Each structure stands twice: as C-alpha cells, then as structure tokens.
C-alpha cells in the first residue's frame, strides 16, 4: 500500500511540475506577443510623426525650385 501511495504522489508531483512549466511558457509567449504589439505601435507612431516633416521638406524644395 505504501508503494502505491508513493507512486501516486510521484505521478501527481510530476504532473504539477509539467503543468507549471507549460503555464510559464504560455505566460512568456503572451508577454512576447504583447511586447511585439507595443513595438509595432511605436514604429507606426514614429513613421506617422515623420510625415509632416517630409511634407514640409517637399514644399520647401518646391518653393525653392518653383
């Protein structure tokens, strides 16, 4: 009977360890996806902030040559 209890305890322990590892990997994946979304948004903001500068430069060149 003691052997059965030890075996059951071992199976439950190993199951909990593997479940914990899976949850940790899932959290890391979710964090990476969230960080990637933030990076994409910041790149978009940087690009959008360059548009007025580019328009001003083009209009200045047009005035200079036109």
From Swiss-Prot:
Modification Phenylalanine amide, positions: 65
Tissue-specific expression: Expressed by the skin glands.
Swiss-Prot/TrEMBL keywords: Amidation, Amphibian defense peptide, Antibiotic, Antimicrobial, Cleavage on pair of basic residues, Secreted, Signal
Gene Ontology cellular-component annotations: extracellular region
Subcellular location: Secreted
Propeptide: 23-44
Top-level taxonomic group: Eukaryota
Annotated Pfam families: FSAP_sig_propep
GO biological process: defense response to bacterium
Role summary: Has antimicrobial activity.
Protein family (similarity comment): Belongs to the frog skin active peptide (FSAP) family. Phylloseptin subfamily.
Record protein name field: Phylloseptin-Az3
Naturally occurring in which organism (per UniProt): Pithecopus azureus (Orange-legged monkey tree frog)
Lineage: Eukaryota, Metazoa, Chordata, Craniata, Vertebrata
């Amino acid at each position: 009977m003691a052997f059965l209890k030890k075996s059951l305890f071992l199976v439950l322990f190993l199951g909990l360890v593997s479940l914990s590892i899976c949850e940790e990997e899932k959290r890391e994946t979710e964090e990476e996806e969230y960080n990637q979304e933030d990076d994409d948004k910041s790149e978009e903001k940087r690009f959008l902030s360059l548009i007025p500068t580019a328009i001003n430069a083009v209009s200045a060149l047009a005035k200079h040559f036109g």
